[in-house]
């Protein structure tokens, strides 16, 4: 690893002088991922009710799509960006990197359980074309004290990129992502591991053909492959293509848009079609009151005709307080790729249906002097086909939990607060409670505490997660999850990081259960080096 660091540092010294002195763009529209940039907060991850334990195995480079009906725990309110940070750039990016048209970030790490981690990203933030290119590789083998090669492993590889430029007045936005995740099945069932590959290309054109008017079109694709490895491997293939056309008019006080979309999906050769036609609007009644809405028609081969709509009202009586109320009838299109990544220990339902139903949300936010923020809210929803693991039917033919789509109601309240007096210093807390029947392996109460402090060259951070209120008929590990870490700023370009995760699991007297009998990695330590060039 030392040799790699030396090579990367040498490459940074070889950058042309012109690349070091260019001015930063006013409004860069390629956002840099904070998973690379904010190492002092790297262990902080958003809790979700969709796939408990998924976030504990590998820190995801990007947020995974949530299955229908599973609302997230309110993320801690983000610290307001420092005054010197241009809009659109994360506060963790060093000032010298923001002033260069080309920036590179690299992160290398290794730790217990044969943990290897590498992430490299390039960003073109100057004149067009603007671009982003990122590669990630991470592996764990021998989780929870098991022998390496025994099926207690996890590997994730990602390659993604984006390109933005103009052809005359037409804005062009191209992006693509390739992801591969292999998870050992821990000796359950006839297979060794489950391999998931996804490829998601997309292209969008936007033409402002007249003042206030914009015509846009996009073409998105999605390709997902699942492979159960073993002496008799089994596979599944899903392919989807979706064109869309939209027209929008924006005035100083309101905007109005219409769009149409078609999607064709092939799941192991079986075709299904979806089509939507909808309109949306937004009105600023004053600086303090904004109303937005949408509505239209949705048709699917399996769902038939549906008529979703949504209304939201935001009231901001003063800069410190805002209230958001929303509700309507929504349709959530679920695909194999979404479900495979969100439910790692479950088999796909057959067929995969759209989930639809009524919902209402209410959220209030209070902030004070840009250092303190408090957020609280409630969610209520009804679902016609929400995914839910069936514990009574475990194990399925492949040693996994059958996943069925059921009718269910969901209700939850949540709150979070954050105090951030300085850039590297913060304290936050998040709480969520389920008020209605919730899926197995989803806690009834979630509590998370996070904190960190930074000085000129040193910093520490930690997190504590407490999950309670599980179904007593299932086996769980109730021991809180404690993680600690720290960093040393060796130079302007290099930061060294040490992390220790799940330090309290030895008190449980056994491995930490994810979806019983599947286990999580458990106590582990990692050393990393982050380099900004």
Task: Go through each PLM region and give its residues.
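Outer-membrane beta-barrel translocator/receptor signature
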Residues: 87-88, 97-159, 168-170, 180-182
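Residues that define the transmembrane beta-barrel architecture of outer-membrane proteins
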Residues: 100-102, 114-118, 153-159, 193-201, ...
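Transmembrane beta-strands of outer-membrane beta-barrel pores
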Residues: 108-112, 126, 137-141, 167-169, ...
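Residues on the lipid-exposed face of transmembrane beta-strands in outer-membrane beta-barrel proteins
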Residues: 120-124, 161-165, 201-207, 239-249, ...
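Repeated loop/turn-to-beta-strand initiation elements of outer-membrane beta-barrel proteins
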Residues: 128-132, 169-174, 210-217, 250-258, ...
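Flexible loop and strand-edge segments within Gram-negative outer membrane beta-barrel domains
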Residues: 141-158, 175-210, 220-240, 269-270
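Outer membrane beta-barrel strand-and-loop segments of large Gram-negative receptors
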Residues: 349-353, 359-365, 373-430, 446-448
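Outer-membrane beta-barrel "beta-signal"
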Residues: 494-495, 519-533
